[in-house]
Amino acid sequence: MAIYLFKITNKHRKSIWRKIEIQETQTLGDFDQKIRESFGYDDDHLSAFYRGKAWSAQGYGEIEPGGQGRGANKKIQDLKFQSGDKLEYIYDMGESYISLVELMDIGAEQAGVAYPRVVEKNKQRNKYCEQCKLKGKKQVAVYNVYYFEAESLEQLCEPCMEYIEEDIDATEIVY
């Protein structure tokens, strides 16, 4: 059975990527679930794959949380991908987290291996909490906090988040 090796790269932060292998008989729903797991995405938003650029190219259908939707049951082998083919993957249609997806290689299945699987990922480059830096501490930041009125962004650790107002927009940092 053929195994497809894809590289999935965050469109706006190219230093964040994963390489995922998937069997030809598995589906875009299976692929979507592995991407969600590997990037730490929740299971509460729609996603979709597009051949070429997102929104303006051939889409394969939306994938709902839990693996349902028009695009979920499309088998990898039926999409006729060739090495070098490029897709765009969108997670969360509102926020539009866009990743570039490139087919790197088509190889043979390894016995005893469970697919899909992450075979490689970027080296983690930690960002550090800005509040802790001011206190002379070095604590890994886990949240991007956006202050709308000041139009500023701050990266904070878990303990410093306890002192932030509830109506502030905060998202987890993906490493």
Language-model segment annotations:
Residues M1-Y175:
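Short linear regulatory motifs enriched in tryptophan with gly/pro/ser
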